């Protein structure tokens, strides 16, 4: 039985990659990360939403394309390969799914149509449910929320945020609320935005079907983890390709370094370890929609395993490049940092493996 991306999924992924090659080459990524040039980021985001990235998972009745998570995983892989400096996993995957699975009919009609028309953009922060840190605690009292949310993703130009408490209740807050303060967090990955949000008596719209029901938030987190895994696979593949290309050109001791057995073995090991990761993340994405009883475990396994494999690829790829691997001239560090940040978002490999063990009754 053949299991892989369909012709349509590959075509869409190729279009995303081509757009990024044309509109967001490495020099543009450098400019964005060095100058925090949001105008260029907005142009890139607008171009990708013109391709339909904002509407991938939205049901057709709300103006979306009605596609499945495997389609989104193919897109995420393409975005990772280009270290795309835009919001995707949070804004256009997790947020729509949170509303689809946790919102009332009225909330779906209100927000999903606006996501489809690109008139609202969500940042999302669920760290309180995944594993609260320090004093980052959100307390809901009626329709008011107080506290602090850490590691909110896709916050650039967000008009709204979806947050949660430690019980899994998700709620929407307006980014313009006078009691809400957004503090940008320092991160090694400058291609995306990570913030801390302070809330002081902020008005919250609770997603109706998430009260005393963890199904919606768990599905939202599962989807996010699969997207991050796919993004890392795309980034790691680029690092391997660059390593092989460099090994064929770089000469040392009168011969190309790719002729040395040690370098050959590093490239072969990276490829052998990464290749199965495609099937792992594709299967997890497929199960999300079609075998839901297995989806949560597979999301944990794909996120944890791929985080480890891509970390190894990032390390060995840098070693193949030698000292040049650390320079900005080649820009390898953008993919390195992307992989490193994906590894920690929505749960480290250790935390996610612990969740997988609990799911299996260990």
Task: Go through the PLM ranges and name each one.
Residues 82-92, 206-207:
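Short, flexible active-site-proximal loops enriched in glycine and acidic residues
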Residues 132-146:
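Cytochrome P450 C-terminal beta-domain/meander region
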Residues 117-129:
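A short, Trp-centered hydrophobic/proline-enriched beta-strand micro-motif
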Residues 125, 148-180:
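A short core secondary-structure module
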Residues 100-103, 163-166, 172-175, 198-200, ...:
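Short beta-strand-to-turn element immediately C-terminal to the catalytic PLP-Schiff-base lysine
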Residues 87-106:
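N-terminal glycine-rich flavin-associated loop
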Residues 133-136, 151-152, 175-209:
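Flexible, small-/acidic-enriched active-site or ligand-binding loops
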Residues 1-82, 102-107, 114-119, 219-362:
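Alpha-helical interface subdomain recognition
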């Amino acid at each position: 039985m053949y299991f892989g991306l369909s012709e349509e999924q590959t075509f869409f992924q190729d279009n995303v990659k081509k757009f990024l090659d044309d509109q967001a080459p490495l020099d543009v990524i450098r400019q964005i990360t060095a100058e925090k040039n949001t105008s260029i980021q907005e142009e890139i985001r607008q171009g990708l939403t013109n391709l339909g990235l904002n509407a991938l998972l939205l049901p057709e009745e709300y103006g979306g394309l009605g596609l499945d998570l495997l389609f989104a995983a193919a897109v995420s892989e393409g975005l990772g390969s280009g270290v795309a400096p835009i919001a995707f996993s949070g804004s256009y995957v997790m947020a729509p799914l949170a509303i689809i699975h946790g919102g009332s009919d009225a909330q779906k009609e209100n927000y999903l149509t606006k996501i489809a028309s690109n008139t609202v953009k969500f940042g999302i922060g669920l760290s309180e449910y995944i594993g609260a840190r320090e004093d980052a605690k959100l307390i809901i009292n009626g329709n008011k929320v107080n506290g602090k949310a850490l590691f909110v993703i896709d916050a650039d130009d967000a008009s709204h945020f979806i947050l949660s408490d430690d019980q899994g209740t998700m709620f929407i807050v307006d980014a313009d609320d006078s009691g809400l303060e957004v503090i940008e967090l320092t991160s090694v990955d400058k291609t995306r935005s990570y913030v801390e949000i302070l809330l002081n008596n902020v008005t919250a719209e609770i997603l109706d079907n998430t009260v005393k029901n963890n199904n919606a938030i768990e599905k939202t987190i599962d989807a996010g983890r699969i997207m991050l895994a796919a993004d890392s696979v795309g980034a790691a593949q680029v690092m391997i390709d660059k390593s092989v290309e460099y090994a064929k050109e770089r000469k040392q001791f009168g011969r190309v370094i790719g002729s040395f057995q040690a370098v050959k073995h590093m490239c072969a090991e990276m490829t052998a370890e990464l290749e199965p990761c495609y099937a792992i993340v594709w299967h997890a994405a497929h199960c999300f929609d079609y075998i839901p009883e297995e989806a949560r475990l597979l999301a944990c396994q794909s996120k944890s395993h791929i985080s480890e494999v891509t970390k190894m690829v990032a390390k060995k790829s840098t070693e193949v490049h030698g000292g040049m691997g650390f320079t900005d001239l080649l820009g390898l560090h953008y993919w390195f940092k992307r992989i490193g940040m994906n590894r920690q978002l929505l749960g480290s490999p250790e935390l996610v493996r612990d969740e997988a063990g609990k799911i299996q009754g260990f």
